[in-house]
Curated annotation (Swiss-Prot):
Function per UniProt: Component of the cytosolic iron-sulfur (Fe/S) protein assembly (CIA) machinery. Required for maturation of extramitochondrial Fe-S proteins. The NBP35-CFD1 heterotetramer forms a Fe-S scaffold complex, mediating the de novo assembly of an Fe-S cluster and its transfer to target apoproteins. Required for biogenesis and export of both ribosomal subunits, which may reflect a role in assembly of the Fe/S clusters in RLI1, a protein which performs rRNA processing and ribosome export.
Positions bound to ATP: 85-92
Sequence positions that bind [4Fe-4S] cluster 1: 32, 46, 49, 55
Gene name of the encoded protein: NBP35
Amino acids binding [4Fe-4S] cluster 2: 258, 261
Cofactor note: Binds 4 [4Fe-4S] clusters per heterotetramer. Contains two stable clusters in the N-termini of NBP35 and two labile, bridging clusters between subunits of the NBP35-CFD1 heterotetramer.
Example GO biological process: iron-sulfur cluster assembly
GO cellular component terms listed in the entry, alphabetical order: cytosol; nucleus
UniProt-recorded name of the protein: Cytosolic Fe-S cluster assembly factor NBP35
Protein family according to the UniProt entry: Belongs to the Mrp/NBP35 ATP-binding proteins family. NUBP1/NBP35 subfamily.
Disulfide bonds: none
């Protein structure tokens, strides 16, 4: 077993990588054609770049790691990306609850992968923030939260809990590749992939590397107000351009449930109809609306399952309905 300090050494020792996974002397320029491109080292952006000679000498063609990733993830039946147009809508919280909810079915083996490299919060919400990753002959072994719920995050590799990850996109992409290629999940029914908010390098990398192994699709999280829906439209446009199937949309923080009387009131007014209206407009499946329950935050802080602690909460009921709709969307019913 390796300590957190040793694992931290592994990730700090990672070279700066270009977007296609090759070791370079410095981060690639903005309009880099990519070291695997036929134009590598020859384009206008290559002139004056410290990587020019390296890129010209590299073999061209498909990334060989894609085949290894496909082989590693072959035992995973369903891969679901959790996306959001902006931060603060509860995407990571919902990813954690999705892991808890799916693993409530003891017949399912579930994995949760935290690819929000600069803001890894899933280990805290799953109650395993102080765990470390084991490395064996078969690869990195994820941390098991329960017998049928495993998690993987860069948080397990940081030397300190509050250590910041200050990386450029290329280095983050390199770690994503290692997570997909080297984490030994064994057989899983579901792999829930929590991604950063927005549409960034990480999203492009994830989609490129997982295309061959097959992604069931994306679950998109929003809140009711128009300022969130504006960014969700951009996220949905990204999915369309990247060829990612949208499994459906979840409206989080949809009203407030009083823990005492369980009456529901509106907090974020859906000025344009909220997530449901957006789904009707764009022809997307509306997976459900989850109300605010302050106890969700307390459970996330303490690393316990809100669904187990408060099974009768309207929020718990709504989450389980979303899970049923998700399983239906991937054909698992």
């Amino acid at each position: 077993m390796q300590t957190s300090a040793e694992m931290g050494g592994i990730i700090e020792a990672m070279p700066a990588l270009a977007q296609d996974g090759y070791a370079l002397e410095q981060a690639p320029p903005e309009h880099c054609p990519g070291p695997a491109s036929e134009n590598a080292g020859k384009g206008d952006a290559c002139q004056g770049c410290a990587n020019k000679d390296i890129c010209e000498s590299l073999p061209k063609g498909p990334d060989p790691d894609v085949a290894l990733i496909t082989q590693n993830l072959a035992p995973v039946r369903h891969k679901v990306l959790v996306l959001s147009g902006k931060g603060g809508v509860g995407k990571s919280t919902f990813s954690a609850m999705l892991g808890w909810a799916l693993s409530a079915d003891e017949a399912l083996q579930v994995g949760v992968m935290d690819l929000d490299i600069c803001g890894p919060s899933l280990p805290h919400m799953l109650g395993c923030v102080n765990e470390t990753v084991h490395e064996s002959s078969v690869g990195w072994t994820p941390v098991y939260v329960a017998d049928n719920l495993a998690a993987m995050s860069i948080q397990f590799m940081l030397p300190e809990d509050d250590s910041a990850v200050i990386w450029r996109g290329a280095k983050k992409n390199a770690l994503i590749k290692r997570f997909l290629k080297d984490v030994y999940w064994d057989e899983l029914d579901y792999l829930v992939v929590d991604t950063p908010p927005g549409t960034s390098d990480e999203h492009i990398t994830i989609n490129t590397l997982l295309k061959e192994s097959g992604i069931d699709g994306a679950l998109v999280v929003t809140t009711p107000q128009e300022v969130a829906l504006l960014d969700v439209r951009k996220e949905l446009d990204f999915c369309r351009k990247a060829g990612i199937r949208v499994l459906g949309l979840v409206e989080n923080m949809s009203g407030f449930v009083c823990p005492s009387c369980e009456n529901e009131s509106t907090i974020f007014k859906p000025t344009t109809g909220g997530g449901r209206a957006l789904c009707e407009e764009l022809g997307i499946k509306f997976l459900g609306a989850v109300p605010i329950d302050p106890r969700i935050g307390r459970c996330c802080d303490s690393g316990e399952s809100f669904l187990d602690a408060y099974p009768d909460s309207p929020a718990s009921t709504a989450i389980m309905h979303v899970v049923e709709a998700l399983r239906d969307a991937v054909g698992d019913v």
